[in-house]
Regions:
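Phosphate/dinucleotide-binding and metal-coordinating scaffold of catalytic cores
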Residues: 1-218
Length: 218
């Protein structure tokens, strides 16, 4: 909420049809509607009204604002590997339930009566080792018994995005979103993004602090 409180906003329901379509609905909880700080999660498609609101997106089964809270290609493949999901199982309603209150942003998701995962303190890691493991995962070469795989599950699914990335605590204790080159790149976008951020800062825009690191991963 705007005042920092964490509250339950509503409930998602998904019914899977034999033809592969998903009938989805969302409804705000009355406690949320009665909250003076309540705001619509999607002003256009999810106004603050009581009762179920149909999704109308049979392939996704959830409103767009909720699907946007999921990771894209990179993070979804991480979730599928972590939970052994088939393509049929890797649909937005099921993926959202696996987040268990994790992820980034203002919206958190968990299955009803399922405990929300607790934030755990992760041991310090060497950036180059984690980056190498992330690239091995993209190549399909990261083995199930690799000691860095559980670490990647913890730091690589929540940031989302279609490209390899993970959260990492630097030596100074600052957390950075580490973005890596992809095997599918014909030109590495990493230095280009860094240059764009630097240019925006020079023009007076407020941008995130960034570093361009060469970890010898080419």
């Amino acid at each position: 909420m705007p005042d920092g409180r964490r509250v339950r906003a509503g409930e998602l329901v998904a019914v899977y049809r034999d033809n592969g379509a998903i009938d989805g609905q969302f409804r705000y909880l009355s406690s949320y509607l009665d909250d003076p700080e309540a705001f619509p999660l999607d002003p256009v498609n999810l106004p603050l009204v009581p009762g179920p609101q149909d999704v109308g997106r049979p392939q996704a089964g959830v409103h767009g604002v909720f699907e946007d809270a999921l990771p894209d290609d990179w993070g979804r493949r991480m979730l599928c590997r972590q939970y052994g999901l088939s393509d049929h199982q890797a649909r937005p309603p099921h993926l959202l339930s696996l987040m268990r209150g994790g992820g980034m942003g203002a919206l958190l998701f968990a299955r009803e009566h399922c405990p929300v995962q607790e934030t755990v303190e992760r041991p310090p890691m060497v950036l180059q080792d984690v980056a190498r493991a992330a690239l091995d995962f993209e190549k399909g070469e990261l083995k199930d018994n690799d000691p860095l795989l559980p670490y990647l599950y913890g730091v690589g699914t929540s940031p989302g995005g279609a490209r390899p990335k993970f959260l990492f605590a630097m030596d100074d204790g600052k957390h950075f979103l580490v973005k890596l080159p992809s095997l599918r790149d014909t030109v590495s976008p990493v230095p280009i993004e860094a240059a764009c951020l630097a240019t925006a800062a020079d023009c007076g825009f407020s941008v995130a602090r960034s570093r361009l690191l060469d970890e010898g991963l080419a």
